[in-house]
A protein has these predicted regions:
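Membrane-proximal, cysteine-centered motifs at transmembrane boundaries in secretory-pathway
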Residues: 1-82
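Juxtamembrane segments at transmembrane-helix boundaries
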Residues: 73-226
């Protein structure tokens, strides 16, 4: 950022284990009210991030901070509730599992809730403002998103008593292979997490299509409880 042609702020992408990115972060820059012109220059870390919309706030730092936190807090609290519900369900399954033989439906639901809540909470502005390790948070977002398809499909398969093991196993194995592959590509700096995100999205779409077909099939066969 330049104020009247003078450089006053700069944020560089530092290569690390999380990737060549500063992470999704807020940049707070203080400058004099006497400044007549400001120039902001962006250099995308990856081609995929070029052209993304940027939001600017001008005013007192405290008022901006309070306004952003107030708007983002409801979504953050809902995400935290989802995490707590997932933890409760998982612990409950572990406790009752010791005394009786039950399937893993509740455990899969608990894990899925924890992953979904963690991912959604990490995407809010509350997490962006409070958590300082933005590279680590960026990795957390990718990791939880990559784990979501497998946990979701295991829950639905167990809950609906889906007997199709073949295609379900293919999706789960593809999910595991994707996790290993993307971590190797990121570690070797061949293809970092941000650039391989489309693979995770493709797997999620495949999972959704599979679940829709299975649910519609069970409805058509009147095997789904009303």
């Amino acid at each position: 950022m330049y104020a009247d042609g003078k450089l006053i702020y700069q944020l560089d992408a530092v290569p690390g284990i999380w990737g060549n990115t500063p992470g999704w972060t807020w940049n707070i820059v203080r400058f004099s009210s006497n400044v007549s012109s400001l120039q902001v220059q962006f250099t995308p870390c990856y081609p995929e991030t070029a052209g993304q919309q940027k939001t600017f706030y001008i005013g007192g730092g405290y008022n901006i901070y309070r306004g952003v936190m107030r708007r983002a807090m409801p979504a953050f609290l809902i995400s935290m509730m989802v995490i707590l519900i997932g933890l409760y369900i998982s612990i409950y399954w572990i406790v009752i599992r010791c005394g009786s033989r039950i399937d893993g439906t509740l455990l899969y639901l608990g894990i899925f809730s924890i992953l979904l809540g963690t991912w959604s909470a990490n995407e809010t502005d509350v997490a962006t403002l409070l958590l300082t390790n933005r590279q680590g948070c960026s990795y957390l977002a990718f990791a939880t998103l990559m784990l979501l398809p497998m946990s979701c499909i295991l829950f639905v398969k167990s809950f609906l008593e889906i007997r199709d093991d073949w295609f379900c196993r293919i999706i789960c194995n593809a999910n595991l292979a994707l996790i290993v592959l993307t971590h190797i590509l990121n570690a070797t700096e061949i293809y970092e997490f941000r650039r391989s995100l489309w693979m995770t999205h493709a797997l999620i779409i495949l999972m959704i299509l599979y679940l829709l077909v299975v649910i519609c099939s069970k409805i058509a066969r009147r095997q789904l409880d009303q």
